[in-house]
Amino acid sequence: MGWIGDFFSGVGSLISSVSSSLGGLASIAGNFLKVVSPYLGIVTNIISVIGNILGVKKDDENLEDIGAKAMKSDKKPENFDSYNDYIKHLRENIKLDKEEMENASKELKLARTAVGATIVSKGIEEKKGMEISVDTWVAMAKAGLDGKIDVVNLILDTFKDKNEQKDFANYVDGKAGFKEEKIVTDKLTDIYKSLEPNASDIDIEKKVMDMDKSK
């Protein structure tokens, strides 16, 4: 595990090194990387697809490119009224060198992806009118929700405040108390019933229970 920790530490250092371009986003992206690193690929895929659905990013835009443009731009997120305006600026005004992108180190590619994911996540928060904790993204990855975007979308709409998101993450980790577990399972049951009205109660219960990865 040592070399993996060193690798992600190096990626984090790359993010910190461009803090002048990213402003406050640098520390947010650094924390994002630290928390999601074991699930980075799954989390970034979930964020990317939700970003597409909500119009935060275009289907042909990838997180690495968005992050690379942010690290290259002389304007920071705080120079704009919203993250969605910032993303529009990156899309329209910052160009990338294709050869440089292809030849970038693995560490730099991951740093750019982490920055891009953080930016799109913030854009999703604006669209949803809520804050989304990094632990919530990780919990959805742990719960096996990659590719189950309808479920992810409704989870975000259902567990909107910090305490609700914490209860959901604790449920996935098998750490929720009895009361919290009951609240979370009831909400997840309602989500699945709305998506699969013809599914049996047993099938829905299994889907909900399968999200508790401690069992």
Which role fits each region the language model picked out?
Residues 51-206, 214:
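Amphipathic, membrane-inserting segments
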Residues 1-3, 209-215:
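Short acidic DE-rich linear segments
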Residues 1-14:
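Short, intrinsically disordered N-terminal pre-domain segments
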Residues 11-57:
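Membrane-active amphipathic alpha-helices enriched in small hydrophobic residues
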